[in-house]
Every structure is written in C-alpha cells, then in structure tokens.
C-alpha cells in the first residue's frame, strides 16, 4: 500500500458508496479485511476480530457483504460465510447473514459486459459525456476522506 497499491482506498470507497445507497449511517457499517495467512501483517481491522468484538459488545445481528467479489469463491463461502459466522455466534451474536456476491445475476453480467465493451473499444475518457472536472472533484474528495481515515499525506 505504501508503494501506491489502491486496494485499501478502493475498498473504503466501494463500502462508502454502498452504505450511502442503502441509507446507512456511519455507525451502522464497517470495512474489515479477510484472508490473513503467513507471517506478514494484513490490512486491518481483521473481519474475525471485528465480528467477535461486536458480538461481545452486544451486537446481536449482522449482515456481511463482500462487494469486492464479483462471484463467490472459497474465500467468501468458507471463510466469510461459515468461519466468520461461527466466530460471531460463539462470541455472543445471534444472527449472522452472509449476502452472496452477484455471481451470475443477469443484471450483473450485463453490467460487466457493458463495462468491458466500453474499455475494449478505446479510451473511455474520450467517450461522449465524460466529465474530467467531475472526476477531478471526486479525486479531491476521495483524497480528503482518505486523509480523514489516517492516510499519510
């Protein structure tokens, strides 16, 4: 990440946009990270740790989504849907619901096909309706949110 990997920021942005679309307040959602393995430290907070903390603090019900996954896989089905469910319930939670990825939903496939078609056809930046000023404003706002979350300037 310190070398410029945008993954963390992309996760934060996606989660924020989903939460806004759902009308959630900041205290109603969080971003956590999965798939720790090996000796290297991974992005935090870790999903299993956060879920256990929430359950111990009295949170009884959670819905868990992984918007970074276009389709479910071993990580989402085994680690997130099953193992993290066990962690949450063992720590005192009562209801854990994993919301599956979009997988082969027709609207999802159509959106992916449209996105790929636009990018395969050339530079989307030169397409009609492209607004460079709006993109610049969004990048500035994204940077301000990242700094507020503790990113280095």
Regions found by a protein language model. Name each.
Residues 1-153:
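Extended amphipathic ligand-handling, pore-lining, and cofactor/metal-binding catalytic surfaces
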């Amino acid at each position: 990440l310190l070398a410029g990997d945008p993954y963390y920021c992309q996760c934060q942005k996606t989660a924020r946009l989903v939460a806004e679309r759902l009308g959630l307040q900041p205290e109603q959602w969080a971003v956590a990270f999965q798939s720790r393995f090996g000796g290297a430290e991974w992005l935090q907070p870790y999903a299993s740790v956060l879920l256990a903390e929430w359950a111990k603090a009295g949170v009884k019900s959670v819905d868990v989504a992984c918007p970074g996954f276009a389709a479910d896989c071993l990580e989402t089905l085994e680690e997130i849907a099953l193992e993290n469910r066990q962690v949450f319930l063992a720590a005192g939670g009562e209801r854990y619901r994993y919301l599956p990825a979009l997988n082969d939903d027709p609207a999802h496939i159509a959106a992916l096909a449209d996105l790929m078609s636009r990018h395969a056809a050339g530079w989307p930046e030169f397409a009609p309706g492209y607004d460079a000023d709006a993109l610049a404003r969004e990048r500035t706002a994204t940077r301000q949110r990242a700094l507020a979350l503790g990113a280095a300037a």
